[in-house]
UniProtKB/Swiss-Prot annotation:
GO terms for molecular function: 3'-nucleotidase activity; 5'-nucleotidase activity; exopolyphosphatase activity; metal ion binding; nucleotide binding. The lineage of its organism: Bacteria, Bacillati, Bacillota, Clostridia, Eubacteriales. It comes from Clostridium botulinum (strain Hall / ATCC 3502 / NCTC 13319 / Type A). This is 5'-nucleotidase SurE. Its cofactor is a divalent metal cation. Disulfide bonds: none annotated. It is found in: Cytoplasm. Keywords: Cytoplasm, Hydrolase, Metal-binding, Nucleotide-binding.
Length: 252
């Protein structure tokens, strides 16, 4: 397959380069990624500033470009200007940290994949759980991404669906399997700590602890139980459950 590879951690991040090195052995890969760390940029795009594109050399034989914009910019610029028309799939990752539960709404990784789907290119986001002060398991995550990719044939790919793949932090032997599941609730209970600086201004820092109230059958639940999770996402945010009710309420 012809694959466009991007991320939100930046073009020099270990995750995207681990994935590129493995995928390029079996597929044609073009990397277009932010020049710097752009985590939690969600689906933001650059409007008021020019976007700078630089060609980057990689140790493995792939075409690579850094972009001064956001992850969503990377996909937009790539599909409009940099890559051929025959891209079969956009893959975003491997992200340093999970993208499950409500966190997907903040994720630049997931949003880059969604941008691909908005361009009618099938897409997948790949994220690996990160534990502070421990070595990331990008090689395991890359293996699972390749496994998912190899299960697909071009005719199987739906161009409006984003596959969200998350890999727990554990050894390959400890992984219990793969679960196709729905999005869960929030991972963390977040809050802001407050300090006062020398000039009397409030200084707020985001803090939080793990949310223990999780729902069975969700990505959050299965990740905590050492399963790889795969969730199909869609960019249509319509709440169909109350569409008719809303019409009756406001138009009747």
């Amino acid at each position: 397959m012809n694959i466009l590879l991007t991320n939100d951690d930046g073009i020099e991040a270990e995750g995207i380069n681990t994935l590129a090195e493995l995928l390029s052995k079996y597929h044609d890969v073009i990397m277009v990624a932010p020049e710097n760390q752009r985590s939690a940029s969600s689906h933001s795009i650059t409007i008021y500033e020019p976007i700078i594109v630089k060609q980057v050399k990689k140790p493995y034989n792939i075409e690579a470009y850094s972009i001064s914009g956001t992850p969503a910019d990377c996909v937009r610029v790539a599909l409009d200007k940099l890559v051929p028309d025959n891209i079969d799939m956009v893959i975003s990752g491997i992200n340093k940290g999970l993208n499950i539960g409500n966190d997907i709404l903040y994720s630049g990784t997931v949003s880059a994949a969604i941008e691909g789907a908005m361009y009618k290119v099938p897409s997948m986001a790949v994220s690996a759980q990160f534990i502070k002060n421990k070595k990331e398991n990008y090689k395991i995550a890359a293996k699972y991404a390749l496994r998912m990719l190899n299960r697909l044939k071009k005719e199987d790919l739906k161009n409006d669906v984003v596959l969200n793949l998350n890999i727990p932090f554990c050894s390959e032997e400890e992984i219990k399997g793969i679960k196709v599941c729905k999005v869960g609730n929030k991972i963390f209970n977040t809050r802001f700590s407050e300090e006062i600086d020398e000039e009397g201004n409030k200084v707020l820092k985001l803090e939080g602890d793990i949310n223990k109230d999780i729902y069975e059958g969700t990505d959050v639940y299965y990740i905590r139980n050492k399963y790889v999770t795969l969730t199909p996402l869609h960019y249509d945010l319509t709440n169909f459950n109350i569409l008719e009710e809303t019409e009756q309420l406001f138009l009747s």
